[in-house]
């Protein structure tokens, strides 16, 4: 399978994630959109690693996955804490820093 197919898929996934970040106001949807964008970047790293035959792309993708898992855990904990204290997870309704 040509590498260009992987790059097209990665760009489509990144576009869907970017669309979710720009249009949605739900904190969970925003987190999922960011994760989708990170996975698109991982797919790009892996596609170029496959083309060059180097394992550096695989190592970078592995570390991005680890950072994304930590980001998701911390972000979900923050969203749950905000929901428990405010009763909403809409980013327009919740202004934590202003109060």
UniProtKB/Swiss-Prot annotation:
GO terms for molecular function: NADH:ubiquinone reductase (non-electrogenic) activity; quinone binding. It is a multi-pass membrane protein. It comes from the Bacteria. GO terms for cellular component: NADH dehydrogenase complex; plasma membrane. Keywords: Cell inner membrane, Cell membrane, Membrane, NAD, Quinone, Translocase, Transmembrane, Transmembrane helix, Transport, Ubiquinone. It catalyses: a quinone + NADH + 5 H(+)(in) = a quinol + NAD(+) + 4 H(+)(out). Its main location: membrane. InterPro entries: NADH_UbQ_OxRdtase_chain4L/K (IPR001133), NUOK/Mnh_C1-like (IPR039428). It is found in: Cell inner membrane. The chain crosses the membrane at residues 2-22, 28-48, 60-80. GO terms for biological process: ATP synthesis coupled electron transport. Its EC number is 7.1.1.-. NDH-1 shuttles electrons from NADH, via FMN and iron-sulfur (Fe-S) centers, to quinones in the respiratory chain. The immediate electron acceptor for the enzyme in this species is believed to be ubiquinone. Couples the redox reaction to proton translocation (for every two electrons transferred, four hydrogen ions are translocated across the cytoplasmic membrane), and thus conserves the redox energy in a proton gradient. NCBIfam families: PRK05715.1-2, PRK05715.1-3, PRK05715.1-5. Belongs to the complex I subunit 4L family. NDH-1 is composed of 14 different subunits. Subunits NuoA, H, J, K, L, M, N constitute the membrane sector of the complex. This is NADH-quinone oxidoreductase subunit K.
């Amino acid at each position: 399978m040509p590498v260009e197919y992987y790059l097209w898929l990665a760009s489509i996934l990144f576009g869907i994630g970017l669309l979710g970040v720009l249009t949605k106001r739900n904190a969970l949807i925003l987190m999922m959109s960011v994760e989708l964008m990170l996975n698109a970047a991982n797919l790009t790293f892996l596609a170029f690693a496959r083309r060059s035959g180097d394992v550096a792309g695989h190592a970078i993708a592995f570390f991005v996955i680890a950072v994304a898992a930590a980001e998701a855990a911390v972000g979900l904990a923050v969203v749950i804490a905000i929901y428990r204290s405010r009763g909403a997870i809409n980013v327009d309704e919740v202004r934590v820093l202003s109060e």
